[in-house]
A protein has these predicted regions:
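Acidic, surface-exposed loops and disordered segments
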Residues: 1-156
Length: 156
């Protein structure tokens, strides 16, 4: 498949089959993605592959923390404090499309929470890839990191 085709067919998957994933395939994907460019070859990315009992334990801990009201600390602000156009409209449309597809009503807070918790289970994928970068890396490393992540997705 051409890269342009892969990009055009891109989708966000929020449900996975309970199928075994070949760990060697994951290694091949990550090794291919390591060829992504990075400023002065810093290669700031780190990846943890989590599966089996360790994945179940991590998922349970994350869900328990979330449902207990424990808030994690971000090393950086991901979203703006206040949304402005056109981003506000795009965000709202995306949420509406997702919740409509999942048949979650606006007033059904319990189902909304359950859907959010699915994030912490990696949407039941058999393997979870956790991506890290040292917190002392500068803003430019986010660009390197993004190219690595895109390479992982294209290699997959």
């Amino acid at each position: 498949m051409k890269v342009s085709e892969a990009l055009a067919k891109r989708k966000s998957t929020r449900a996975f089959l309970n199928k075994t994933v070949d760990v060697e395939k994951i290694k091949r994907i990550l090794n291919a993605a390591k060829q992504a460019p990075s400023g002065v070859n810093t290669q700031p990315w780190q990846v943890a592959v989590v599966m089996g009992e360790k994945k179940k334990l991590l998922e349970q801990r994350l869900e328990n923390a979330y449902r207990s009201g424990i808030k994690g600390q971000m090393d950086y602000q991901y979203y703006p404090c206040e949304w402005h156009e056109p981003y506000k409209t795009r965000r709202k449309a995306c949420g509406l499309q997702l919740y409509t597809a999942l048949e979650i009503n606006r007033d059904d807070k319990e189902k909304q929470i359950d859907q959010w918790v699915a994030n912490y289970r990696a949407f039941d994928a058999p393997i979870m890839l956790l991506f890290f970068m040292d917190s002392d890396m500068a803003t430019g490393s986010f660009l390197d990191y993004g190219m690595f992540l895109q390479s992982v997705m294209l290699a997959a």
